[in-house]
UniProtKB/Swiss-Prot annotation:
Record has Membrane as a keyword: yes
Lineage: Bacteria, Pseudomonadati, Pseudomonadota, Alphaproteobacteria, Acetobacterales
Site feature: Cleavage (non-hydrolytic): 194-195
Pathway membership: Phospholipid metabolism; phosphatidylethanolamine biosynthesis; phosphatidylethanolamine from CDP-diacylglycerol: step 2/2
Active site: residue positions: 195 (schiff-base intermediate with substrate)
Protein name per UniProt: Phosphatidylserine decarboxylase proenzyme
Subunit: Heterodimer of a large membrane-associated beta subunit and a small pyruvoyl-containing alpha subunit.
Record's cofactor remark: Binds 1 pyruvoyl group covalently per subunit.
Subcellular location: Cell membrane
Top-rank taxon, per record: Bacteria
Residues recorded with modification Pyruvic acid (Ser): 195
Length: 225
């Protein structure tokens, strides 16, 4: 990645979910630095640092999906922590035939915006309260707080994306609702401060990624549909 590309990524506009954090920390930074008391200045400095962290964490860079519409794209940035065949969760109503699940772990330093892996219609949204285990653990898929979306492709096949909260992440944001139609790579949500995103491929579709591979949400090809 070139220096210019790196700067564009770091300086990308923040996601709307950052607004309350930026307003609060920005106001505290200005107030703290304006007051004559040393503790207030320390608080102002700390608030300024948190403001910078929020700008970086909530960055929302533009992505350019491939023109080929027969691809499943990464729903999130991060690195692949597991690729295995499993039976989809009952809440997705995708049957009991094992399909490939690709789990992507997002560290605090990754872009946390979630994107649709393919063009289609959201036909199910199911939220599950749960624990906040380390999202890189395999059991996080079943025990952690999560939000599952089933996406029906134009040809009628189903695939799914599951947003999973992690040890630090305590807030899943999802704009998608049942009946909404999305294009591949289009934004649909965000998970705050470290998380995991699972992609369930349609039956018969093989993954093209391996454990440890770095994902770029909305751009990296995970499978051919």
């Amino acid at each position: 990645m070139s220096l210019i590309q790196s700067l564009k990524l770091v300086l990308a506009r923040p996601h709307p979910a950052a607004r309350p954090f930026l307003l609060a920390s920005g106001a505290a930074a200005l107030a703290g630095r304006a007051l004559p008391w040393r503790p207030a200045r320390w608080l102002g400095t700390a608030s300024g640092l948190f403001f910078g962290f929020c700008l970086y964490f909530f960055r929302d860079p533009e992505r350019v999906p491939p023109v080929d519409t027969h691809l499943a794209l990464a729903p999130a940035d991060g690195h692949v922590v597991s690729v295995e065949k499993v039976v989809p969760p009952d809440s997705l109503d995708m049957g009991d035939v094992p399909v490939w699940r690709v789990a992507t772990f997002l560290s605090v330093l990754d872009v946390h915006v979630n994107r649709m892996p393919a063009a289609g219609t959201v036909t199910r949204v199911a939220y599950h309260p749960g624990q906040f285990l380390n999202a890189s653990l395999d059991k996080a898929s079943e025990l952690n707080e999560r939000n599952a979306l089933r996406l029906t492709l134009p040809d009628g096949r189903n695939m799914a994306v599951v947003q999973i909260a992690g040890l630090i992440a305590r807030r899943i944001l999802c704009d998608a609702e049942e009946g909404m139609t999305y294009e591949a790579g289009e934004r649909f949500g965000l998970i705050r401060f470290g998380s995991r995103t699972d992609l369930y491929l349609p039956p018969g579709v093989e993954p093209l990624v391996t454990v440890g591979q770095t994902m770029v949400g909305g751009e990296t090809v995970m499978a051919r549909l």
